Every structure is written in structure tokens, then in C-alpha cells.
Swiss-Prot record:
It comes from Nitrosomonas europaea (strain ATCC 19718 / CIP 103999 / KCTC 2705 / NBRC 14298). The lineage of its organism: Bacteria, Pseudomonadati, Pseudomonadota, Betaproteobacteria, Nitrosomonadales. It comes from the Bacteria. It catalyses: N(6)-dimethylallyladenosine(37) in tRNA + (sulfur carrier)-SH + AH2 + 2 S-adenosyl-L-methionine = 2-methylsulfanyl-N(6)-dimethylallyladenosine(37) in tRNA + (sulfur carrier)-H + 5'-deoxyadenosine + L-methionine + A + S-adenosyl-L-homocysteine + 2 H(+). NCBIfam families: miaB-methiolase (TIGR01574), MiaB/RimO family radical SAM methylthiotransferase (TIGR00089). This is tRNA-2-methylthio-N(6)-dimethylallyladenosine synthase. Catalyzes the methylthiolation of N6-(dimethylallyl)adenosine (i(6)A), leading to the formation of 2-methylthio-N6-(dimethylallyl)adenosine (ms(2)i(6)A) at position 37 in tRNAs that read codons beginning with uridine.
Length: 443
């Protein structure tokens, strides 16, 4: 029996993708298989996220919970990867000497070598370098068992927003060559994948080298993926307003496989706060992108990110954000109270707003967006929606669920044979975060 691997993943879809790649490479090169619990494992990996406050303390807390396992299993290895590893580096081993491996998002492909070096030398191994796109050359071909898959097309971020730690933990923007991405997507299609989600910190900043030496922008990549047989839906996340080009907007007119949903983080509706955040656009420019998108795809769904309580945010600034929500009619949001990230410019800004005021603003914003979402969902009742059936419902395993083109989850009475298929569903009711439906007579 081979040795076992346990991975705990925190944070974004990029981390989910990276964790899957860790498992793939350790299966391919070390013959490891996944364990369901840390107690079963011979290697425990924490793939961490540093976006939120106290992320580092959360990691050390979780490390402390598995430390005792080494008492009964001396050969057990414990590793920390992801953005906290990149940010903290050797400090992790200083605070937790029982940690064996520390590696960043760009060095996960070196895990087999790090494991070998740890066993050979008996010393902890730390590698948080930024070897650009090398990791994709070392990773085994993508494997999947479902009808949906993530595909990372670029790494890092070069925008340096004043509040964000990502450029320091994942490095500058580096795009995979066009043919590498297309080969991965085509391979997934052969395995039965029908929907791909393209990933990147600023996915629409993609600039991939082509075989002829030219550079493919994000719209060109979408054109090529659209032609791959078997792929019926294309999603992507996360996009940046500064990179939302006219060519990308036009893609929504000519590419029917490109879903009718865009996640386009705005962060604030105040131009003064946007400037302090160093976002590089105004609210007028943001609304112009949305208006042009709706001209070519009138029913497109727009979701966003908001940071509440950025240093210096006044009530007028917050009201400007609420007005932007009214103007755009956002469908969904990921909204948080600002938390300073060490080493970022915004961490040094004075902050005189009380936590209670920030909480009140956050609740008001979330309530407004929830009302928008409910109104949009209510408008879908009695319509027929095409969904990709993903499998049993999380809340009720006796039911099944799928996702609409505009990213709504629909629960319905079905059977396992529908999993991985596109079906037509008549929407019958709206719940707080999902829709209910029944298989349409039009099937």
C-alpha cells in the first residue's frame, strides 16, 4: 500500500487548483494516494491564503492541532504551502520547528524534490522562490472525474493595489503559452469535461506566447478554446476592470459558449477611495464597461468584490458605493471589512473609523445586494434554464443540482444518470441563495 497524503486548502479557486496539482504530482512521482483525515496521512499539507486578517495565526493554530501526530508516527512530514508560506518563509519553521516543508505557490512542482531532500538531510526544506512559469512544465497532465474543471492560465499580479498582498506572495504576472493552455483544455475535454473555468489573479491580463512568436491576449485565448470540441461552457475568474478591453467585450457577442456571468471586482464606489487603493479606474469607467457588456449581452449577470472600511472611508464614500450598487444592479458580491496586510502601503494609513460603523456599513451593503439578487432570481421563475448537472445537492443528497448560465445553483428532483449532462429546467421557486426547478417537458 502506498503512502497517504492529506491536503487542507484555504482561500480562493487558485488554491483549489494548486492543491489538485499537488495531489497529481505526488501521485505521479511518489505513488501517494489521498487520505480522508490527517490521522491517516504520511504527509500533511496546508495550502494557505493570506488575503484575510490573522491568516498567519490561523495557520499556526492548525499546525498545532496536528503536531501530536508525530509522536505516534515519527516519519510523518508536515508542510505549509500557498501565500502564507510565501509571505512568512523560514519564520514558519522558527515558530513551528516540527514543520518539514515550506513552499510557495510557484514552487509546488518541486514538492517531490523537497520531500527527498528532507528525508536525506533531516533538515526542514524552504523554497519560496518565484521561478516564473516553470511549475507548469513539471506538472503531470490534468486529470478529472467530473464535467467541470479549473485551468490556470496565468500566475501572479502586477497591479500592486495598495491593500493587496498578492504581488508579494505570488509574484508578478506571468502567462502560460497559448498552446500549453489549449493542450490542457483539450485533454480535459477528452476526459468528459464540458465546462472550464479559466483562473488567474487578473485572468483578463493574459498575454500568452504563440508558436509563431506573437502574443495572444485573453480574447484570442477565448476564441481558441471556443473551438475545442466537447467544451460547451467557458467561465473565468477573477477579472480586473483595467484589463477589460473592447475585444473582450466583443467576445460576449460572438462566443455563445462564454457564459452570461462576469465577476468584476470594483472594491468601492468612491473615486477618492479607488485612487487611495490604486485601482487605476473611476466609477464612470467601471460603469462604462458594464454598460457596454449589457449592450452585447443584455441579460448578463455581474458580481463583484467590495472592501468596506478602507482607511479614510467616510459616510459619503460609503454612500457612493451604495449608489454604484443601485446603478449596476450587482447580482452577488464577496464583501469584507478591510483588514491591513503586513508590507502593503495601505497598512500604514491612519484608520479612524470604528469597527461598529464598519460592521453596520457591511450589513447594509450585503442586504442591498441580496435584495438585488432576489429580484433577479424572482425574474427567472417560470423560465426554462439550461443547466449542467453537477451531482447530488449538498443540502439534500436525495436531490440533484446544477448551475445556470448566469451562475445560479438550481436544486431539482433527478437521478444520478443526469450527472454531467446539460438539461432544461423550469424554475419554480426561489430560496435565499438557490433556485428550485423541475425537469422541463421540453426535454
Amino acid at each position: 500500500m502506498g503512502s497517504k497524503l492529506y491536503i487542507r486548502t484555504f482561500g480562493c479557486q487558485m488554491n483549489e487548483y494548486d492543491s489538485a496539482k499537488m495531489a497529481d504530482i505526488l501521485l505521479s512521482e511518489k505513488g501517494m494516494e489521498l487520505a480522508e483525515t490527517p490521522e491517516e496521512a504520511d504527509l500533511i499539507l496546508f495550502n494557505t491564503c493570506s488575503v484575510r486578517e490573522k491568516a498567519q495565526e490561523k495557520v499556526f493554530h492548525d499546525l498545532g492541532r496536528v503536531r501530536h501526530l508525530k509522536n505516534s508516527k515519527p516519519d510523518l512530514l508536515i508542510g505549509v504551502g500557498g501565500c502564507v508560506a510565501s509571505q512568512e518563509g523560514p519564520e514558519i519553521v522558527k515558530r513551528a520547528p516540527f514543520v518539514d516543508l515550506v513552499f510557495g505557490p510557484q514552487t509546488l512542482h518541486r514538492l517531490p524534490d523537497l520531500i527527498d531532500a528532507r528525508r536525506r538531510t533531516g533538515r526542514p526544506q524552504v523554497d519560496i522562490s518565484f521561478p516564473e512559469i516553470e511549475k507548469f512544465d513539471r506538472l503531470p497532465p490534468a486529470r478529472t472525474e467530473g464535467s467541470t474543471a479549473f485551468v490556470s492560465i496565468m500566475e501572479g499580479c502586477s497591479k500592486y493595489c495598495s491593500f493587496c498582498v498578492v504581488p508579494y506572495t505570488r509574484g508578478e504576472e506571468v502567462s502560460r503559452p497559448l498552446d500549453d493552455v489549449l493542450t490542457e483544455v483539450a485533454g480535459l475535454a477528452i476526459q468528459g469535461v464540458k465546462e472550464v473555468t479559466l483562473l488567474g489573479q487578473n485572468v483578463n491580463a493574459y498575454l500568452g506566447k504563440m508558436i509563431n512568436g506573437e502574443i495572444a491576449d485573453f480574447a484570442t485565448l477565448l476564441d481558441y478554446i471556443h473551438e475545442i470540441p466537447g467544451i460547451e461552457r467557458i467561465r473565468y475568474t477573477t477579472s480586473h476592470p483595467r484589463e477589460f478591453t473592447a475585444r473582450l467585450i466583443e467576445a460576449y457577442q460572438r462566443l455563445p459558449k462564454l457564459v452570461g456571468h462576469v465577476h468584476l471586482p470594483v472594491q468601492s464606489g468612491s473615486d477618492r477611495i479607488l485612487a487611495a487603493m490604486k485601482r487605476g479606474y473611476t466609477t464612470v469607467e467601471y460603469k462604462s464597461i458594464v454598460r457596454k457588456l449589457r449592450l452585447v449581452r443584455p441579460d448578463i449577470s455581474i458580481s463583484s468584490d467590495f472592501i468596506i472600511g478602507f482607511p479614510g472611508e467616510t459616510e459619503d464614500d460609503f454612500e457612493a458605493t451604495m449608489k454604484l450598487i443601485d446603478d449596476v444592479h450587482f447580482d452577488e458580491s464577496f464583501s469584507f471589512i478591510y483588514s491591513p496586510r503586513p508590507g502593503t502601503p495601505a497598512a500604514d494609513l491612519p484608520d479612524n473609523t470604528s469597527h461598529q460603523i464598519k460592521l453596520t456599513r457591511l450589513y447594509r451593503l450585503q442586504e442591498k445586494i441580496q435584495l438585488n439578487a432576489q429580484a433577479i432570481s424572482q425574474g427567472m421563475v417560470d423560465t426554462v434554464q439550461r443547466i449542467l448537472v453537477e451531482g447530488p445537492s449538498r443540502k439534500d443528497p436525495g436531490e440533484f443540482c446544477g448551475r445556470t448560465d448566469n451562475n445560479r445553483v438550481v436544486n431539482f428532483a433527478g437521478h444520478a444518470g443526469l450527472t454531467g449532462s446539460f438539461i432544461d429546467i423550469r424554475i419554480t421557486a426561489v430560496s435565499s441563495h438557490t433556485l428550485r426547478g423541475e425537469i422541463s417537458d421540453m426535454q
